[in-house]
């Protein structure tokens, strides 16, 4: 498996992936025109022709037969072209000494606080390929790209995680809150956002703080929680240094997690090594390896052995990277458990 930049030839495969995501993955709508537009912008970003606020680095996971089975992306900066909304989960305190009453009420504040940060987004792996190292490669490959081209990204990375919804796409949070203001199904609002029609959010979203005690018990219970299918991705990002700081999605209340870019494990511990081609040996461990290129970027995960400034890999790994012995690579142990 390799992770590489998307190309226009991948559009049919992207449409098929988008159709299988279900609701809740806003940035990957099953809309051919929107996906074609996004691929075009991604190609510009990899060529260095996009401003940071427009840069959308879209990657695909491809097997050795050339089949695209997954997708992930990095947005250079959010909210610089149109407002970026989250709810900040805060606290409102009311008290009366005379009545001996003290109440602390969790409150949702509409916020644009995460504007300007880079974002990890659009992570999706086909169900038939959710095994082995594939998920870790697809998600963590982005960190090596950021480490190699650090100047393209902000000092903080965020990731909006998919919130709770049932098999029919029903979101408890949306049913208790959003539906009253938008008068549409959660799936429709999710789709409109994904195809770039975001003006309705600013026009219809309530601007005043919202006391969560007015929401249903079910809705309150999903604030800051992820969809079960998203739990592995959340655990992976937490292992890299991400944490929840009280921001949630305005539609499904899924958590927006964040980390300082330079403190993310795979970025901070990655290093440039000289590629050696041979037999890694019994003491090899899984490494994430990047060929240090931008437009012709290739990233893979494979057993490797680092020693004395070199990284020993087998011939197939070198072939996947499109490199020969003596080339420079950026590499890091694949899993956070290997740190140190």
From Swiss-Prot:
Keywords: Acyltransferase, Arginine metabolism, Transferase. InterPro entries: Acyl_CoA_acyltransferase, Arg_succinylTrfase_AstA/AruG, Arginine_N-succinylTrfase. GO terms for molecular function: arginine N-succinyltransferase activity; N-succinylarginine dihydrolase activity. Transmembrane segments: none annotated. It catalyses: succinyl-CoA + L-arginine = N(2)-succinyl-L-arginine + CoA + H(+). Its EC number is 2.3.1.109. The keyword NAD does not apply. PANTHER family: ARGININE N-SUCCINYLTRANSFERASE, N-SUCCINYLARGININE DIHYDROLASE. Heterotetramer of two alpha and two beta subunits. This is Arginine N-succinyltransferase subunit beta. It comes from Pseudomonas aeruginosa (strain ATCC 15692 / DSM 22644 / CIP 104116 / JCM 14847 / LMG 12228 / 1C / PRS 101 / PAO1). The lineage of its organism: Bacteria, Pseudomonadati, Pseudomonadota, Gammaproteobacteria, Pseudomonadales.
């Amino acid at each position: 498996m390799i992770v590489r930049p998307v190309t226009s030839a991948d559009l049919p495969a992207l449409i098929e992936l988008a159709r299988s995501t279900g609701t809740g993955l806003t940035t990957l709508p099953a809309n051919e025109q929107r996906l074609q537009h996004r691929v075009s912008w991604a190609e510009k970003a990899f060529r260095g022709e996009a401003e940071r606020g427009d840069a959308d680095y879209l990657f695909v996971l491809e097997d050795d037969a050339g089949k695209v089975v997954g997708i992930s992306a990095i947005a250079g900066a959010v909210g610089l072209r149109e407002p970026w909304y989250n709810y900040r989960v805060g606290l409102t305190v009311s008290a009366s000494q005379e009545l001996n009453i003290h109440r602390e009420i969790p409150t949702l504040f509409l916020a644009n606080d995460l504007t300007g940060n880079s974002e990890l987004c659009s992570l999706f792996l086909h169900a038939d390929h959710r095994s082995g190292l594939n998920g870790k490669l697809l998600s963590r490959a982005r960190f090596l790209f950021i480490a190699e081209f650090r100047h393209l990204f902000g000092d903080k990375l965020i990731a909006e995680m998919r919130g709770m919804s049932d098999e029919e796409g029903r979101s408890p949070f949306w049913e208790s809150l959003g539906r009253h203001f938008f008068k549409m199904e959660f799936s429709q609002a999710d789709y409109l956002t994904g195809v770039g029609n975001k003006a309705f959010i600013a026009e219809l979203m309530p601007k005043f703080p919202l006391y969560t005690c007015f929401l249903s018990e079910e809705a309150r219970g999903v604030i800051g929680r992820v969809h079960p299918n998203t739990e592995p991705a959340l655990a992976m990002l937490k292992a890299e240094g991400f944490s929840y700081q009280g921001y949630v999605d305005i539609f499904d209340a899924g958590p927006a997690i964040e980390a300082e870019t330079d403190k993310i494990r795979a970025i901070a511990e990655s290093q440039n090594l000289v590629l050696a081609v041979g037999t890694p040996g019994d003491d090899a461990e899984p490494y994430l390896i990047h060929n240090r290129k931008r437009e012709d970027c290739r990233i893979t995960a494979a057993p490797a052995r680092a020693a004395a400034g070199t990284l020993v890999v087998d011939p197939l790994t070198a072939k996947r990277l499109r490199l020969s012995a003596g080339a420079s690579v950026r590499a890091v142990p694949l899993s956070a458990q290997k740190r140190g």
